Amino acid sequence: MKTTNKKELSYFRLKLESYLSEHFPEKVEDKPFIKARADEALTTYCDSVEEGFSYPEAESMASEVLYRDLHFSKYDTLVSVLENEFEKELPSPLPERLAPILLKNRAIQETFDKYNLTDDFDASPEYDTLYTELTGTVVLLIEANQLPTIGDVSALE
């Protein structure tokens, strides 16, 4: 049984690490968080099976625990802004590469900090306001730092 638990723990850890690398690259190196969340998901899975839930039901419950508070992604939001609003200036794969760098920028952080970012934030009316503010912040960062882009940034004005 010990081998099974270790395999399941590895499954939840790998599942979480994969998700984080795609949506929360800033959390990929947070090993204590990953271990704690994977352990909690494993416990939920085992307890659910023990309580009589089917394996798919237990998997679903464990996934809820695994991804708790990880549905709204600053990274995904910023990539979306860069892809949609700066398509000509920052062609793929630049948005995915630039987003982690921009997430460390104080102006970008301050923009996100104005909002209560819950799991369902992207369905709220405030999301559009955040999106617009992020677009403006990126324009200001490009102009203030005279960052090179492909195409003409002044066309945005």
Predicted feature locations:
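C-terminal alpha-helical interaction appendages
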Residues: 1-157
